[in-house]
Amino acid sequence: MYNKNLSFDLPDNIKFINPDPFFDINEILPKVSILISDYSSVVTDYLLIKKKVIFYLHDYEKYQKKIGLIDNFRKILPGREIKNYIELKREIKNKQFNNKRINQNIKLHMKKYYDVGYKDSSKKIFNFIKNI
């Protein structure tokens, strides 16, 4: 998460990532305990390592109108939804996360949307392309 305008002290274990055009997010994902994101596709990569996500959706209605999302987007979130800055601040300061519910949501989400197996991925892709 990067936001130079946060107006409260954060615990020492929370780090900001400075945006860099050559930065590879995948290098740090395994080191991250909890990801705070919005609608970014990085969440999909992060869920593969089965860790917790907080969705900071302060502009949901605006984003839904302008960009669009699937109808049940909020219902299938594999993590906690935060709707405003005050909730985000409280969530970060409390460091309290409903681990069982979130872990269960991650498992269900992964099974429903990404359950294709991780074994022999390169071989499967090669065979798929070969058979086109």
Task: Give the role of each language-model region.
Residues 1-20:
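Catalytic donor nucleotide-activated moiety binding site of glycosyltransferases and closely related
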Residues 4-9, 24-25, 44, 69-72:
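Short, flexible, glycine/charge-rich loop motifs used to bind or transfer phosphoryl groups or to couple energy/partner
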Residues 8, 48-99:
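Nucleotide-sugar donor-binding patch of glycosyltransferase catalytic domains
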Residues 11, 21-23, 68, 102-105:
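A short alpha-helix capping/helix-coil boundary motif
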Residues 11-12, 47-59, 108-117:
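A short, terminal or domain-edge coil/loop segment
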Residues 17-24, 76-79, 113-116:
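Short, contiguous acidic/charged loop-to-helix segments that flank catalytic cores in large enzymes
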Residues 22-66:
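A donor-sugar binding/catalytic signature common to diverse glycosyltransferases
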Residues 84-132:
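C-terminal amphipathic helix plus adjacent low-complexity
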